[in-house]
């Protein structure tokens, strides 16, 4: 990811140049621009199919929807990756003055698990401080992501605000003008890099000079800036200005208040309302010569994303200044041994997998306000088909109170209409317990039990409850009717912990009080399989207060035995223990305490010795680190049933429905 430090307004050229340099080395590279200008010079939207307009991004941020914004960026990125099949993607960081660009760039970088290339304007010495400021948004992990830097545009002309401007006046040996600061005629020095005194904090991949030819305007661009009428070739380009028809050159624009008899100018601007054909392109405006000249003094040096010719030529120009050896090594450097699953990427993956599963999920607490709001979002996003239990009129009244709409994609079930249907089947399933029809009718008064019977009959594909019911109320019917899955000796519960850079799996944090070694081994295996199913590379740490053989005690012995059993049962999984939590997640601690471990320092799945430990750690991490925890997700049932915290937010319910739909889809395979 090219990370702008300050107003690095040559990012478009730098990104195109790096892509071209990578392609020259045989890489299948492309560029991804998360945001693009709202409109091009013609006033039309110039965003590519993979970019969001900056105006739309501002709306997301103004509405407090930063997470949704990053997920939308991820969706565009994944479509680009799928359509292009690129093995290297150069992400162009965001330069913006309407929101905190450093904060958004950090969020995008972490979501994509991208490496960083800081891009700075000016000499390397000045760039040092700019890089440090920008990297401050990435925390301790930022320095490990930097793979090089780029310097650019030190000699570009700028306006009073520091914005790069296009100077169209006079002539120079480069064929442009005398004051443009252009390096276009200079032979590029391949691999030009930082020459500042002292040690540079990053290896410079390129030092790209300014070239005004990269920003040569089209006649259509000029017409838009001048708000004039264009006749002729809209794509003819200019990089100079003349006020004399006789001396005007073919690369210049002639500004005049009279129709010239003849001129070599590429574009003629007729002022004061004068009209008539002249030059390859003619722009007619009611403005005076002086006003037009004033407008030309304020032209920004930009390349619009719809200007394919300039995009290509600017990339070819910039590519000459990249160090070939360093560029060749970039693809290898960026290939990660242990790629991270960021929270944004995880949420996006949940949504996509759930949509693909296309399942009906029972929500027995159908008139509970948070559940109603979640159902509306689930249906709108096509995550699943929510099935709400209760009187339809009452549910719709709640929806109206909450300001949401339950339209197409939401189903309603009135329990009174269907309870009797499931009495015989429930009696049959519980006959060994002596259940009578009267008992069955009493049990089916509970909507959770009723929904569980529908799940058993394959009339819905999963069940989510717990917003107002206890965990026991949610799980007991499933254990009595659904039973455990083939090969599962117990049901366990995990939480997905959405840490800043990586999603972890914590288990068991909700069900098993004091599991023995065999049960812990099963929990470890179930949790590893769950992690893998949700796109997380499982590296399982069996957690206790000691690492390896450094300590003694019942929990150490328990986790040592559980680790051995899990490894024997599933040699294909990466499982290690006992490990302390810090040794599991911190590479420097792991290097000291468990240097030979394949898990220490890079664990993604954490198995705790007891419910007391697991629940305490999950809540401590959730609250102290302000981490989103999704779950508990139940493992080991024959069909997916998931419990909610009674303090669950609407987001929690939405993602729990998504998880349940994904589980249902996996059970079909």
Outline where the language-model segments fall.
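Flexible phosphate-sensing "switch/lid" loops adjacent to ATP/NTP-binding sites
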Residues: 1-282, 286-335
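Anion-binding alpha/beta catalytic cores of soluble intermediary-metabolism enzymes, centered on
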Residues: 337-600, 605-669
